[in-house]
Amino acid sequence: MGWADAALTSPVTGLPLLADTAHSLAGGSERWPVLEGIPFLRADRRSLADAALAALDAGDTEPALVLLLGDQDNWARTPPPDEASRRAVVRDAGHISFRDAMDRLAFGAVGAYFAHRWSDPTFLSGLALAEAHWAAPARVFELACGAGHYLREFARAGANAVGGDIVFSKLWLARHWVAGPAPNLVCFDADAPWPFAAEADLAFCHDALYFFNDKPYVATRLLAAAGQGTVLLSHIHNRAWPNFSSGAAITLPEILELFPQATLYDDH
């Protein structure tokens, strides 16, 4: 887990989590699965975590991975992929494309969004924001990192990058097709207690703030994660402006309540 290694904690009890096997973390009587270096720490998915752990403890990595690849967030617009498709994407991961993998995982419109993200104006505006405030951070944390597009850019710039997302399959895609092995990845729910307390020089969140239910809590944790560094939020969405996205956007006055010292830019 790189710089966050010593700070991993249970999202349920807050106890420190340490590796007890090559595929699990333990704290007190709790254990959590780790697949392909990605800890699965969703507090609201305890039964799923236990099922994946049982498979891993039995030496069955593929069934554990197939289980976690079927998990989604509450805003998903498509049904989860069936088990046969999940097994196929695990089996063929070494020789299929990024787009093929997302199709098999039933990403739907999100797959198109990720496939074309490199040229998406909102992605480019996020890059411009990061470049405008870049101060050679040694440690970067990205919340809701998705398939790892920004993580790859941060890692290429020499930062020690850590990404967190609520959907395990997105992190798995980041590891295999987009961000590669360099960034450290954690699967957790940002509306629940965060499973780490380490500080980064830059805390970044793009095109996701409107998805969180407890925005004041998430804002507090982002500020804490940045410590004495910088928090950058891009493509926040303004509820007063028509759009067709999922989530629960807020207005500019509400954004300023969350980040009263913020500098605001028009997202054009």
Identify the residue ranges that each predicted region occupies:
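Conserved beta-strand signature within the Rossmann-like core of class I S-adenosyl-L-methionine
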Residues: Q228-I236
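A short glycine-rich, Lys/Arg-flanked "PGG" loop and its adjoining helix->strand segment in the class I
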Residues: P216-G229
